[in-house]
C-alpha cells in the first residue's frame, strides 16, 4: 500500500436546517463551532465542531439540486460521510483506483476547512 490512514479527519452530517442543528450541538451538547463556511462548488453551507483530533461537520444544501439536498431526499438527515486523513492523498487516490474502488473524485478536490 502506498499510503497510510492516520486518523478520522471528520464525520459529515447532512442536515436540512443548519441553524436548528447548530442549536442542538451548541446548546444541548455544549460544543463550540469553528465558524460557518459556504462552498459554492458543492452547493453547501457547513459548520465544523472540533472534537479532539477529529471534527463533526454539519452540511446544509444551498440549492435543491446540490449533493446534500439529493442525499437528504434519498436517505434523510444523518451521517453522509466519514473522512479519513491519509499521509499522501494523491497516492491514496491512485492506489484505491488501481484496486477498483469507485471514486467520486480521481484528483484531490478542496472543500470546506481546506479539506481535500
Language-model features and meaning:
Residues 28, 67-71:
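A short, polar/proline- and glycine-enriched secondary-structure boundary/capping micro-motif
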Residues 58-66, 76:
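Conserved secondary-structure micro-motifs at functional edges
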Residues 1-20, 77-86:
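N-terminal beta-strand motif that seeds the catalytic metal site of vicinal oxygen chelate
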Residues 71-101:
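Mid-chain, well-packed structural core segment of small domains
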Residues 3, 13-55, 62, 91-94, ...:
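Core segments of cupin and vicinal oxygen chelate
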Residues 69, 115-116:
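Short, conserved acidic/polar surface loops in the N-terminal third of protein domains
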Residues 66-67, 105:
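Residue-level signal for pocket-adjacent positions within structured domains
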Amino acid at each position: 500500500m502506498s499510503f497510510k490512514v492516520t486518523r478520522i479527519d471528520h464525520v459529515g452530517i447532512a442536515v436540512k436546517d443548519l441553524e436548528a442543528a447548530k442549536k442542538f450541538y451548541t446548546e444541548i451538547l455544549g460544543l463550540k463551532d469553528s465558524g460557518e463556511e459556504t462552498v459554492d462548488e458543492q452547493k453547501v453551507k457547513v459548520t465544523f465542531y472540533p472534537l479532539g483530533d477529529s471534527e463533526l461537520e454539519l452540511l446544509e444544501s444551498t440549492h435543491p439540486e446540490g449533493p446534500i439536498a439529493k442525499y437528504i431526499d434519498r436517505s434523510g438527515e444523518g451521517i453522509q460521510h466519514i473522512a479519513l486523513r491519509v499521509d499522501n492523498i494523491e497516492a491514496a487516490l491512485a492506489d484505491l483506483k488501481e484496486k477498483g474502488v469507485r471514486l467520486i473524485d480521481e484528483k484531490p478536490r478542496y472543500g470546506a476547512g481546506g479539506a481535500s
